Amino acid sequence: MTLPTPLPVGPVNAYLLPGPPVTLVDAGPKTPSAWEALLAGLRAYGLAPADVRRIVLTHGHPDHFGQAAALAGISGAEVLAHSADGPKYTADRSVADHVLEALRLAGVPQAFGPAVLDALRQSRKLFDPLTAFTPLADGAALPCGGGTLQVVHTPGHSAGHIALVADGALIAGDVLLEETSANPLVEFTPEGRRVRTLPLLLTSLRRLAALPAETVFPGHGPPFRDPAARATALVDHHVRRAEEVARVLAAAGPQTAFALAQRLFPGTDALHVVLAVAEVMGHLDLLVADGRVVEAASSDGATIYRAGARERTARGDVEDDGAREGRSCP
């Protein structure tokens, strides 16, 4: 069923599996129109909210899980999700703190902070926190209607993102979309260490490409065929974008992720700066892992990125780091 959202991404998909047990995959945002659409979708199959016995969540973004708590409260349905998104599902304060820390590391001016915090507050209106859920692990098998749903952990867009595979069908959440690519959003470990999400996303896409699936049922948009081809195309897209980031950085000199985002996405407003910065940080992470970019902390704590020696040599700049930085001989 297709549920409306107030977000630029447009409608979100929820998938009803007749079971037994009757299973709903994702539940839409907490809005009156999405709730009415969910009820109408259930009625179309002769069902009421009380008939839903299991809710499986692909990831902890409000457009996908916002109504899960309300539906479970009515039906007593078991809610299942990956524990890595637990702070999102429970509205833990650390989620907002980590977003602000990511902006600081990226060198985003403090003037953007109020708009970002307001966006987070608006997002908070789109879901009721879960008080409890059953954690899902990679490889878990969920019996459903005489078959089995296989859980595949697909981090990158969100730390606890999962996909479900059964009988040639892939319920992919937001990791595999036909018309757009999922943003590699900034994530932190419980200990406060930033996770390099784009490398994880590419690993997830390559893993999905290898699955025995023929049809994708995505989080947004209609079903489509050939998940392997689409997953491979998305990996190639991110590799090309990383090359573009490398070229801009080599030409511009040392930059913060925010400064690079301003060059790559000029005119980005405060509400979208988090997405722009997260994407640039993701591609920088790929380049750092490949030895083509070096990162260091500036005096104010922001991370500064510069082209590594290998990248500069490849572009015809053969000065070593010491010569460029004025290092004296011992």
Feature roles, as predicted:
Residues 10, 33-36, 43-143:
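Active-site HxH/HxHxD metal-binding segment of metal-dependent hydrolases
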Residues 29-31, 122-127, 131-133, 141-143, ...:
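Metallo-beta-lactamase
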Residues 73, 154, 288:
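Short, contiguous alpha-helical
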Residues 244-330:
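C-terminal regulatory/interaction regions
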Residues 23-25, 56, 79, 171, ...:
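Residue-level marker for buried hydrophobic side chains located in beta-strands
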Residues 96-100, 183-190, 264-267:
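Short glycine/proline- and charge-enriched loop/turn segments
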Residues 58-64, 82, 155-157, 161, ...:
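Histidine-centered divalent metal-coordination motifs
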Residues 1-45, 49-51, 163-178:
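Conserved beta-strand hairpin/beta-sheet module of binuclear metal-dependent hydrolase folds
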